[in-house]
Every structure is written in structure tokens, then in C-alpha cells.
Amino acid sequence: MNDTWRSRLKEISHITADPFLRDFHKLHTNDKEQIYSILHNPDNVVEQTFKNTIIKSMEESMFRPLIPTQQMKRRQNDHHNQGPPPKVQKSTVDSLKSQHQIDQQNLDWFLSQPLEDLEVMTVPEQYPLTVPAVLPLAELYYLTQTLASIKLLPGSHKVLMTENFESALAEGKIAVLYSRIEELKRQGKWSLRQPQKFYDPFKFIRKSKKKSFHWDYLLQEGKWMADDFRESSKYKKWCCVVIAEAVEQYWKGRKVSHQTFVDVADLKKIDKSIIRNLPVYTGLGGDSREPPIATVSKLVYPAEDNHWYKIALKPHHHHHRHQTTHQGLFGSTRKYNTLKPPKPPTPKNIEYRIPTIWLPEDDKRLIHYVAEFCFNWDLISEHISSSSTAVSLKKYESNIERRTPWQCFERYIQLNDKFQFSDMKGVYAYHAQQWLEQAHRAQSTTKRRISPLGVGPESVQRGNRKLRWASMFDAMRKAMKKREIAAAKVNHRKSTAELQANQNVTEPKPNSDRIPTPAELSRLKFERDKTLHENHINQQATRARMVQAVAKPAPAPAPAPPPPPPPKPVKRPTTPNGTPLTNEQIQHLLQMQKHRRMLQQQQQQQQQQQHQQQQRRIHFPPAQVSKVINDIQQQNPGLSKDQVTKLAAQYLASLSQQGYGVPSSPVPPHQKNQTASPMSGSPNNA
């Protein structure tokens, strides 16, 4: 082989040793067999060698930090010089330790412990030994908003891996998820259990372009059921065969005796150890073990798991149950108890409120019921009232012993030293706060106690009975006063109603419930317009006469005829004080006088009409009225009873206006055409 081929082979070996040309000294292998193998080996072997070399160099370059060119040259020169290895300077600070030292110390501590105090576990290699910190979703959202990885990645000075970008994408997903959850919570659409979304089978199949429908799936399940029934019948037959074979074997071999127990001495050493470790089933003892949450089969490793396992050492806890401070989702403890106040009474006359008296037994009972019923003040009030201290007074309950829901709440917050207004939540929280503040102001200004009063047994024996009787008499006095006020109101209302009835006897009240007809409304409108028009004309005439009387000069006396007697001067109307009236007042006075005259004329006309009607009115006897009705019914048999009655009334009214009565004999033929003509019409004319 000449030098040209040898140099080319060295270049190829250099490429295989350093594909990315990171070695500036152009090193190559000196192994002649490896160089000649490139020539003698097949092409696929040489190609695979190149691939492996390139992959190995890529893996090394990915985890190798970026080193400047000058520093890399210096390191390679130092490596070629092969000087003495540098000494590693150890830190003089005891608190600074490397990770290797910490791991070694932990291992030494575990090895020094006795085996009874350790738990040796085999864990898959990919599982971490320590559980990572679990952060709530709100904290993760806060971290993604303050220190977002997507903002830190562009300015990073280190090599970025795929895991870094995946964590940044996961943070973005967490932010979107948290914001969506909070939005659903505000709308009241978020629950702990999300139901599966319903898909319409026909729409879903049409979108996914499937050819199978619900009926196809139903037929497929029917085939499965048929196969299942067929196999179940085969299984039953097989069970019968097994039982028959067992019975046959029993009757054939019952003369031969078999040993029903095992002698431990005949067993091997391994079998003896297995029997020795078998659990012994005895009666129930005092030491009971809590069943695990997961099944036992989940603790057994799969038989076909070929992954590597690592050994983990853990301190052994001798107590059976692990006491933890973390509560589950439906735990009994809460962060804080929400205090929901009941509906407060009205703050009217709050300064006259009588304080309630609470004994030590009542306070204990109140605290017990509050813890039992969890601030359900209605139930608390019922239970405390049923077991009240007033034994002798069963039908009467004084104000100082009354136990309403609000009084129970007021006494509870008085016993609670750590109570704050911010602890109250619910519908009546604001109203309760306003009531308590107003009661405190009234108590400080009036110097009178309003809040509940807690007393001891010695104070109860002295004054409780007097306070009870005083409260009873006070309640009786208030009840009597209320009755007197109610009776006085009723009597005053009756006297006022009687006086109004006496005044309005002559004035009949119009029927306010009756709705006027359109004809009546049009008539009233016509009368109103007519009255207004007449008043306007009268005002203009009166104004013209007054202007003529005031402004027109007196005519000169004629020389021929003798002078008439001088007319009396027209005096201008004045007030009782002598002040002359203005033109507007005079017009108003004239209008009132005219209106009074018109009313007098209308009354006179009405009286005259009533007098004339009384004179013209003719009283018909019942026999004549019935005779007229019968005649009309005979002449018009097709009319109804109401129509016949109306025709008879019209006929009698026309007779009364003409001034003569009904003849005693039947109506003659020549008068029938004159008088009975309105009765012989059709019902439509009637």
C-alpha cells in the first residue's frame, strides 16, 4: 500500500474518531488492524461503524458545555502534556457538603440502625425515593403569573432541554385551566364531579362517518349474550361430568384407606420453613389491623416486569395507624366555622328593650346545642325553650326568660371572646351588624342595659322571682293598654261612620262600580260643552255692558221735551270693607249669580214635570195588565215571554200619556189598528 492510500485511510479513521472535528490536533487511531478493517469489511459493517461513531459523538456534544476555542486548545495541550493530576481543594466550611457526601452519610446512618427499625423496599428505578411537594392549583397559578418559564427561557445561559419547554407549556395549560375553573365557579357551573359529555348517536356517527348505528350495537350485544348462554350450558354440563366422575371414583376406591394428614417429619427443610411461616387462624384478639385502602394484589410485583429496581431504606413506624394532619375532601374539620346570624328584630324602641337573664346552666346548654346543631338557631331556641328554668309558670314566659333565636345568638357572641363582625356570613349578616351597633349606642347613651345579663345562682335566689312577677305585671299592663286603644279606635271609627251616614242621607251616593255607557258619556260631554259655551257668551255680554256703562258719556238733554227725572247713578259693587271690586271679581260675581238663577230655574222645571207626571200617571189594576198581556200573546204567538212583557209595558205607557185607561172589554177592531199596532210588530221591531 502506498503512502497516498495510507494517508486517506488515516483521514477516514480521524472522521470515525471525531465526526464533528472538535479535535484540533487531528488525532487518529494507530491501530493498523482497525484501519485495514475498513477496506476488508463489507459495506454494511463499515456503514454501521460510522453510524455508531456519529451517534456517540452527538450524545457527548449534547451534554458537553459550550467551551471557548482558546480554552479547549489549552485543555487539550494540558492533556497531551500528561502532567501530574491536579489536587482537589476541599472546603474548610463544615456546613458546605457535596451531594456525594450527603448520600454517603445517609447510607452510613441507615446501616448503623438495627434491622427491626428499618423498612427495606425495592422501588422501580424510574420512581423517586421522596415524594415531591404537592402544590395547590392556586399557588401554581400564582407562580405561572409571577415567574413564568416561557419568559425565562429566552434569556437562559444554559443548555435547554425538551423538559424545560414541556414544563413551560404545562404552566400555560395550568393558567388557562385555573382561569376557566374560576370562571365556572363564579357562574355556579363547577362541581367536584364532571359528568361525561353526551353525544347524540346520529350526529356523532354522521360527523365521524361511521356506518354502525345503535341498532347494530344492540344486535352485536345480543350475539354476545347468545354465546354467553351457550357457553354457560356447556359449563354446566362439564360440572355435571366432573361431579359424576368424582362419585364414581369415590365408590371405586372406598375400600382403600388414605392418610388425611401430613407428617411434618417427612417433609423437606424448605417445606418445614414454609409451614412454620404460615399464619395461624385463632379467635379474635385485641390487636386489630386496619385493612389497607388498596387491594393486596396491587402490592405484588408483576411476573413479567424486567425493569431494574433500586433498594430504598426507610425508618419503621411502630404505630399501626399513621396519624396525619391532612384531611380528605369530605373531612369533618374546616378552616373556620361560618357564623350565620338569624333575622334580627326591628330596631324600633330598642332603648326600651328588657335584657334577658341567663343562668350558668343555660350558658352550658347553649354552648352544647350550638356545637350539636351547628348554628341552627331555630333548633337551638326550641331545645332551650323546652328545657327552660321556669317550671312553675308553664303558660307564661316573661321577657327575661324568653329564648328567641336572636337572643340565643346575642348571648353566644357575648360568651365568645374572639367574636368579630367579619365572622358573620349569610343573608342577615349586615342587618345583624347594624342592630348590634345601634344597641351598643343606645346602651351607652341611655345608661340602660340592653344586652343579655349572666347571673349566678346566688343572684337568682334573691331577685329572680321579683323580676319575674314584675315582668308579668308589666306584660298585663301593656296588654290592657293595647285593648283600650283598640276599643277607642273602633268606637271612634263607628261614630265617624254614623256621622257621615247622617250627613249623606239626602245625597244618594252614585254607584261608583257602574261603568257609564258611550251614550251617557256623549250626553255628559254635550252638556258640559253647552254650559261652557253659554258661560262664555254671558261673560262677553256682561263685559260689553259694563264697558258701555263706564266709558259712554251721558247724552245731551233735548230742548223740546221736558227733561226726564235724573237716573240713579250706577254704584260699583264693593266688598264689605268698602273696597271697590276689580273687573275680574265683578265678572266672577255675575257668573255666580247667573249660575244660581239657572239652578233655580232647573229645580222649578223639574218640580213642574214631576207634578205633571203625577197628574197624568194612571194606575192600572193587575187584572187589566194580565188581560193586555194575554191579548198580545194571542195576537203574536211567536213572541217570548220577555218580549210580550216589554210590548205590554210600552202599550200601557202610551195609554197613560194619552190620558185614558185600558177598556174593560176586548179591544175593538177599529181601535186595534190604532192602539195595538206597536204590539203587533215583529220581535225585531220590538
Swiss-Prot record:
Keywords associated with the record: Activator, Chromatin regulator, DNA damage, DNA repair, Nucleus, Transcription, Transcription regulation
GO MF annotation: an example: chromatin binding
Location(s) in or outside the cell: Nucleus
Residue span of region Disordered: 71-97, 493-517, 544-617, 657-686
Statement: the UniProt record of this protein carries the keyword DNA repair: yes
PROSITE patterns: HSA, MYB_LIKE
Biased composition (Low complexity): 599-613
Any GO CC annotation of this UniProt entry: NuA4 histone acetyltransferase complex
The keyword Cytoplasm is assigned to this record: no
Residue ranges, compositional bias (Pro residues): 554-568
Gene3D superfamilies reported for this sequence: Homeodomain-like
One of the protein's GO biological processes: chromatin remodeling
InterPro entries: Homeodomain-like_sf, HSA_dom, SANT/Myb
Domain called HSA: residue spans: 202-280
Domain Myb-like positions: 354-418
Biased composition, class Polar residues, residue ranges: 497-506, 574-588, 671-686
Family that this chain belongs to: Belongs to the EAF1 family.
Subunit structure: Component of the NuA4 histone acetyltransferase complex.
The protein's role, per its UniProt record: Component of the NuA4 histone acetyltransferase complex which is involved in transcriptional activation of selected genes principally by acetylation of nucleosomal histone H4 and H2A. The NuA4 complex is also involved in DNA repair.
Protein name, UniProt field: Chromatin modification-related protein EAF1
Provenance organism: Candida albicans (strain SC5314 / ATCC MYA-2876)
